Swiss-Prot record:
UniProt KW keywords: ATP-binding, Cell inner membrane, Cell membrane, Ion transport, Iron, Iron transport, Membrane, Nucleotide-binding, Translocase, Transport
Signal peptide feature range: none
SMART domains: AAA
Subcellular location: Cell inner membrane
Protein's name according to its UniProt entry: Fe(3+) ions import ATP-binding protein FbpC
Organism of derivation: Brucella suis biovar 1 (strain 1330)
UniProt gene name: fbpC
EC number in record: 7.2.2.7
Pfam families in alphabetical order: ABC_tran, TOBE_2
Reactions catalysed according to its record: Fe(3+)(out) + ATP + H2O = Fe(3+)(in) + ADP + phosphate + H(+)
Oligomeric form and interacting partners: The complex is composed of two ATP-binding proteins (FbpC), two transmembrane proteins (FbpB) and a solute-binding protein (FbpA).
Source superkingdom: Bacteria
InterPro entries per UniProt: AAA+_ATPase (IPR003593), ABC_SmlMolc_Importer (IPR050093), ABC_transporter-like_ATP-bd (IPR003439), ABC_transporter-like_CS (IPR017871), Mo/tungstate-bd_C_term_dom (IPR008995), P-loop_NTPase (IPR027417), Transp-assoc_OB_typ2 (IPR013611)
PANTHER family: SPERMIDINE/PUTRESCINE IMPORT ATP-BINDING PROTEIN POTA, SPERMIDINE_PUTRESCINE IMPORT ATP-BINDING PROTEIN POTA
GO MF: ABC-type ferric iron transporter activity; ATP binding; ATP hydrolysis activity
Length: 353
């Protein structure tokens, strides 16, 4: 394999309709070369349609798609200089790992010997050197996934597309393989467009996350930006659970805001907040609970569940039920206990209305 040539991706006012249904209404986005960008969102948000448009498996109703600055809008899939890793891996069961990786090269016109050499190099690249003789059935789920990645990379695409590549793996293997994908992408420097509905997966692998909703971009930013500074209640709750309650921003200056919640004042990062009514996103682990509620923000224990290293509570308050994660597992709070809710310094974000 020669050096990776990472390419940029640009969608310019792309609309995709299926009959009378508009899956993507006027979508514009940019992916910088050498970055891993994740399209994240609930089912039906348009993330897979976006990936399929980029792959050439669908064509836009209007707008332009560029890869590496080249207009590929009307090009077939095999002329776009992108490779895709499918959710099912799509490995041929009767072919060895080496034959699977070499297949795309041979189909592209490489001589058999050169295709085999490149395939062997590709397998080494993903940590499967010496395993080219094995059939897919003789590999673990994680190894099959790496064969699929190797098959895509040996074609030396400008952009690698990954369509929910970890969805068929169990939770423990998923964590390990997502780390391997991220390390490989950083080591080789290729551009990757990654689709998932798993927030933890997106946070772990991405340079940039694009959260999609109803065919549009709800928010784009780094994993830290989206988690710590959500632009809306939807983003706050989607990027890890969040309790959203009304608040009033009293003042905001020098990067710090003073807010009032349930009659009590608190200091939180301002993040462009303005003095006016707003909402406060509260992460489940951003509060402590104290028995015997006094004034201010208080509630009653409605439900608790012991999960080994933490206890999950539902607290009934005047603003509805709050979901709280408490690492203090020595003794759980009994049901119907009145509690005061105290904020920690992290895990709070103002959402401007």
């Amino acid at each position: 394999m020669t050096a990776i040539r990472p390419g940029s991706v640009t969608f310019e006012n792309v609309t995709k309709k299926f009959g009378n249904f508009t899956a993507l209404p006027n979508l514009s986005l940019t992916v910088e070369p050498g970055t891993l960008v994740t399209l994240l969102g609930p089912s039906g948000c348009g993330k897979t349609t976006t990936l399929r448009l980029l792959a050439g498996l669908e064509h836009p109703t209007s707008g332009r798609i560029l890869v590496g600055g080249k207009d590929v809008t009307n090009l077939p899939a095999n002329e776009r200089d992108v490779s895709m890793v499918f959710q099912s891996y799509a490995l041929f069961p009767h072919m060895t790992s080496l034959e699977n990786v070499a297949y795309g090269l041979e189909s592209s016109g490489f001589k058999k010997n050169e295709a085999r050499e490149r395939a062997e190099e590709g397998l080494k690249l993903v940590g499967l050197g010496g395993m080219g003789h094995r059939l897919p059935a003789e590999l673990s789920g994680g190894q099959q996934q790496r064969v699929a990645v190797a098959r895509a990379l040996v074609l030396e695409p400008q952009v690698l597309l990954l369509d929910e590549p970890l969805s068929n793996l169990d939770a423990r293997l998923r964590r390990r393989v997502r780390t391997e994908i991220r390390e490989l992408q950083q080591r080789l420097g290729f551009t990757a467009d990654y689709v998932t509905h798993d927030q933890d997966e997106a946070l772990a692998v991405s340079d940039t996350i694009i959260v999609m909703k109803e065919g549009g971009i709800a928010q784009k930013g780094s994993p830290r930006d989206l988690y710590e500074a959500p632009a809306s209640a939807f983003i706050a709750d989607f990027m890890g659970e969040a309790n959203v309650v009304p608040c009033e921003v009293i003042s905001a200056e020098n990067g710090e805001a003073v807010i009032r919640v349930a009659g009590l004042t608190h200091r939180v990062p301002a993040r462009n907040a303005q003095p006016r009514p707003a909402q406060l996103a509260i992460r489940p682990n951003a509060v402590t609970l104290q028995p015997q509620a006094g004034g201010g923000f208080s509630g009653t224990v409605a439900h608790s569940a012991y999960l080994g290293d933490h206890i999950e509570y539902e607290i009934e308050t005047e603003h509805g039920k709050l979901f709280i994660v408490d690492p203090a597992v020595e003794q759980s709070l009994p049901l119907q206990t009145d509690v005061s809710i105290q904020f920690k310094t992290r895990g709070l974000a103002i959402i401007n209305q």
